[in-house]
Swiss-Prot record:
ATP binds at residues 409-416, 472-481. The gene is fhlA. SMART domains: AAA (SM00382), GAF (SM00065). GO terms for cellular component: protein-DNA complex. Required for induction of expression of the formate dehydrogenase H and hydrogenase-3 structural genes. One of its GO terms (biological process) is phosphorelay signal transduction system. This is Formate hydrogenlyase transcriptional activator. Residues 663-682 bind DNA. Residues 202-344 form the GAF domain.
Length: 692
């Protein structure tokens, strides 16, 4: 069948039709105008436009029913396999009645898009030799169109083809323009957020900046960054809630990872978008969203923060309003999450570098302090006495464990040396032992030294400082004079021992540490507990494995060895050549009480080395006495002039029938400790059993 484009509409009629159709802004309006024109000209009762999208293989349908109701529909199944598919393969006019239509396209007839009609006609829409759809006309009566009417329908179709193509081009141009504008705006947002977050190297500041930018651009009210904690199976949550536009609430907490939505994202490494309901099985900290926002929260979006193949954490966004997480917004939020991941990676790296730098500085200071003090400490354990042998057996027994050790003994007995021996024999010997003296230090300064502080934590805290517990991570911490620790600081020490965690002064961040504690004191902690000067729970926690160091007076057989070792060490340090010590000097030193113990002995030897001329050690006897007046048994018991120590002890033992201890024993009468008397009896060769 041939068509006459101009038909007999007349120039004016054709112009009016063309002008009317060209004025339509979109395809739905074009379909409605076409229906009115064909209805007014009695050519059809309704008209529609079917467009074919070759790229997506979908069909779009625009029509107006006889009752004036507009219809818009698209799919890639029923409609796409209807009459438009036929017109694409055979570009001739397609016409049929409803019965034929139903037999040919039963699914389309049953879809409700086409109410029962009399006759149907579909003409191809073409532009530049390309068919891109069809223009359909429907009559309610079963009466085919005459040849003259087909001419007019074809004329309408030609005009509709031109107009539809223009509308499509305009729509596509608008879509492209909108896309360009959106991409430009998205790029600006990305640049703004990237510049804002990449300059933040502190995690708290970074989270605050991320929340501010996301809230500003997306109006999202609840923003969190979730990172894995140093503690196993724990999460650190940094949250910001915009309950008040001008005063957002910032929170930080640590929660269990098990059973959380974040755990699902860590496993899948994929975005998770869910509609929230208060009845959903949520983890306790996720249910807190409802405590904060009531039932306003609608949607939760969790975006993985990836650095290469490593997942650093999760960006978690909760929104009260619907339709915030659109496809376009989610695409942009994914890109933002990539930038945030870079910033988080940088901040964590900076945090680690800063921590290692501070640790290195503190280690250098501590090492310098240790080197400065090394000359005043004996460099190795010296002693062959049974008392020292028992101590060393205990050291060897406990060293390989991580148990807390409490070293007890008088001042100057070598408690730090024993602590160092325990550390060197332990599995932690690869790292330097950290030490801290608790005596004569104010509580605030001691707390800062032990646990560290943040910048601005107190007046004068101009920089962050790492404490001894943090410095001793994976190593041993020696707390000397622990009995002098202020009572108000003891609970914090107890918490570290029990939980292996603490906070720096001025911070609420929990720091995990793996420290083996070795404590020492010259005080009677049991008595201090009874006098409420020391916490009983801390005492029990420290007293896991006590080691009692004997005073020097109870191991006189070790004194000659110590004198020789100190003499040669000090002489070498002073550039002297002393290779001989008189036996009388050794006997004199061995007979002394040494209330200052090994430290006092070392000081006496150092003075002797200074005064020595030649290579034989010269001890100034008038400056020291073999038995000090306040500890001499003669002061309390001797009433016979000229009675020496040996004779006095023999006499008192005979009078007490060989009883040493107790209120009526020899030690009590002589004014000595039981252990001191036994030590002297051993030195003088006195057997109490032979005297009884």
């Amino acid at each position: 069948m041939s068509y006459t484009p101009m038909s007999d509409l007349g120039q004016q009629g054709l112009f009016d039709i063309t002008r009317t159709l060209l004025q339509q802004p979109d395809l739905a309006s074009l379909s409605e105008a076409l229906s009115q024109l064909v209805k007014r000209s009695a050519l059809a009762d309704s008209a529609g436009i079917v467009l074919w999208q070759a790229q997506s293989q979908r069909a779009q349908y625009y029509a107006t029913r006889e009752n004036g109701r507009p219809v818009e529909y698209e799919d890639e199944t029923v409609l796409a396999h209807g009459p438009v598919r036929r017109i694409l393969s055979r570009p001739d006019a397609l016409h049929c009645n409803f019965h034929e239509f139903t037999e040919t396209w039963p699914q389309l007839a049953a879809s409700g898009l086409y109410p029962e009609f009399g006759h149907y006609c579909l003409l191809p829409l073409a532009a530049e030799g390309r068919i891109f759809g069809g223009c359909e006309f429907i009559r309610q009566e079963d009466r085919p169109w005459s040849e003259k009417e087909y001419d007019r329908l074809h004329t309408f179709t030609q005009i509709v083809g031109v107009v539809a193509e223009q509308i499509q081009n305009r729509v596509n141009n608008n879509v492209d323009y909108d896309l360009l504008c959106r991409e430009r705006d998205n790029f600006r947002i990305l640049v703004a957020i990237t510049n804002a977050v990449l300059s933040r190297l502190d995690i708290d500041e970074l989270v605050s900046e991320v929340a501010k930018e996301i809230h500003h651009y997306f109006n999202i009210d609840a923003i969190s960054i979730v990172l894995r904690s140093h503690r196993k199976n724990k999460l650190n949550i940094y949250s910001t809630h915009y309950l008040d536009e001008h005063h957002p609430a910032h929170e930080q907490s640590e929660v269990d990872e098990a059973g959380t939505l974040t755990e699902r994202v860590f496993k899948s490494k994929e975005m998770l978008l869910i509609n929230l309901n208060e009845r959903d099985p949520l983890a306790p900290y996720e249910r807190m969203l409802f405590d904060t926002w009531g039932n306003q929260i609608q949607t939760l979006c969790l975006l993985p923060l990836m650095s290469g193949k490593t997942m650093l954490g999760v960006l978690k966004l909760a929104q009260c309003e619907e339709k915030v997480f659109t496809t376009a917004n989610l695409k942009l939020l994914r890109q933002i999450a990539e930038r945030v991941a870079i910033a988080v990676d940088n901040a964590l790296a900076y945090q680690e570098i800063h921590r290692l730098k501070e640790r290195l500085v503190d280690e250098n200071l501590a090492l310098t302090e240790q080197l400065n003090n090394v000359d005043s400490e004996f460099g190795e354990i010296i002693g062959r006495s049974e008392a020292m042998y028992n101590v060393l057996k205990q050291v060897e027994m406990v060293a390989q464990s991580d148990s807390t050790v409490l070293i007890l003994g008088e001042t100057g007995t070598g408690k730090e040396l024993i602590a160092r021996a325990i550390h060197n024999l332990s599995g932690r010997s690869g790292r330097r032992m950290v030490k801290m003296n608790c005596a004569a230090m104010p509580a605030g300064l001691l707390e800062s030294d032990l646990f560290g502080h943040e910048r601005g934590a107190f007046t004068g805290a101009s920089a962050q400082r790492i404490g001894r517990f943090e410095l001793a991570d994976k190593s041993s911490l020696f707390l000397d004079e622990v009995g002098d620790m202020p009572l108000e600081l003891q609970p914090k020490l107890l918490r570290v021992l029990q939980e292996q965690e603490f906070e720096r002064l001025g911070s609420n961040k929990l720091i995990q540490t793996d420290v083996r504690l070795i404590a020492a004191t010259n005080r009677d902690l049991k008595k201090m507990v009874a006098d409420r000067e020391f916490r009983n729970d801390l005492y029990y926690r420290l007293n896991v494995f006590p080691i009692q160091l004997p005073p020097l007076r109870e191991r006189p057989e070790d004194i000659p060895l110590l004198v020789k070792a100190f003499t040669f060490k000090i002489a070498r340090r002073m550039g002297r050549n002393i290779d001989s010590i008189p036996a009388e000097t050794l006997r004199t030193l061995s007979s002394m009480e040494w209330p200052g113990n090994v430290r006092e002995l070392e000081n006496v030897v150092e003075r002797a080395v200074l005064l020595t001329r030649g290579n034989v050690l010269q001890l100034s006897l008038p400056d020291i006495t073999a038995v000090t007046p306040d500890t001499s048994p003669v002061a309390t018991e001797s009433d016979k002039e000229g009675e020496d120590e040996y004779q006095l002890i023999i006499r008192v033992l005979k009078e007490t029938n060989g009883v040493v201890a107790g209120p009526k024993g020899a030690a009590q009468r002589l004014g000595l400790k039981r252990t001191t008397l036994l030590s002297r009896m051993k030195r003088l060769g006195i057997d109490k059993d032979a005297l009884a």
